[in-house]
Structure formats: C-alpha cells, structure tokens
Amino acid sequence: VRLKEDELSKNMIKRCYSKNFHEKFPTYSSCSVSENFKYYPYFKEWCNKQAGYTSQDDKGNAFQLDKDILVKGNKVYSEELCVFVPKEINMLMVKCGRKRGDNPIGVFYHNREKKYVAKCKVRNKTVHLGYYFTSTEAFIVYKNFKESYIKEVSNKWKDQIDVRVYEALMNYHVEITD
C-alpha cells in the first residue's frame, strides 16, 4: 500500500524533472523542488503538519498540493509556499493559454460574430459573459466576474483551508497578462 505522501512526492518530482511530462505540460519545465522536499522523510513530516492535508472536498476527494496560490507564478515546490487546497480552489487558477491565443485571459475571438467573447469556467461549466467590440472590454467583464467568483469559492472553504490561502484568494487580482 502506497502512502499519500509517497504519491505526492513522486508526482511533484515527475512534474519538475520528467522530460516526458514536460512534453505534455511545458509550463512545468521551469519548475523545481526545494532541497528539503526532495528528502522524503522531511516531506512526509511536513505534509502531516499542514492544514488541509487530511481533508476531503464535498465529493470525498483529498485536498491537492498547490505551489502557486500563495505567490502567483511561483515555480518552486517548497515548505514556505506549498499548501493543500480542495480541487475547486486549485482549478480556479487554471489558465487556457493555448485556446485563447494572443487574447487576454478569459477572452476569445468569435469569428462568426466578429466580436470578442468573455467566458469563465464555473464548477466545470463554461459561463458565457457576453460579446464585446474590443478584447479589453471583454477582459474587464471577465476580470470582474472571475475575481468575484474566486471570493465566493474562498468564502465557501474559509474554515477548511490555511488562512494564508484564504487571504491570498481574497486579495487575488486577475491581470490582463495572466
């Protein structure tokens, strides 16, 4: 029987150092693991002391290890910046760069309408936020909607997540360059 910490450790190492993984998920090619986290007994002990480590979401899924909620864009798995969060929170920060091309986050060009459309994922469903003449207009609508949604989800999980996660999410700002 594999321990949860063992799976987490192996997945973390694979994400940072596997060339095969990087071919499928190139954003991880610049990620690394702190020296302490490379030492399994240390990582195991650290996990067992963290808020959310033994928690489950409302579907019975274990909370996930996250490296970049506390510091946007963080590329290092380390004890200072990693936290355990429910999948719903982890999915809030997923960016779909390949699908949107050169447009701002949350914005796509609709060829048939000849307008920009703002869209946002909410609980795994796409919410259409309207058509706009400029990508900037569409982005502002997306930004306001997304920041409000992040706060809503943060409040839902407030009593079950690390206070640092709650504060980071409540202060999160969507940037046009995300």
Where are these regions (language model features)?
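Extended, polar beta-sheet/loop recognition surfaces of beta-rich domains
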Residues: I89, Y149-D178
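A short, exposed loop/beta-hairpin motif centered on an aromatic-Gly-Thr core
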Residues: C31-E35, K125-S135
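Short loop/turn hinge sites at secondary-structure boundaries
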Residues: K19, E23, K151-E152
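Short, structured coil/loop segments at alpha-helix boundaries
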Residues: R2-L3, F21, H110, W157-Y166
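Generic "edge-of-domain/loop-turn" microfeature
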Residues: I89, K114, K125-V127, E137
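An aromatic-rich alpha-helical recognition segment common to small helix-rich domains
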Residues: F43, V107, A118, Y132, ...
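Short, cationic Gly/His-enriched loop motifs
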Residues: R2-L3, K10, R15-Y17, K24-K115, ...
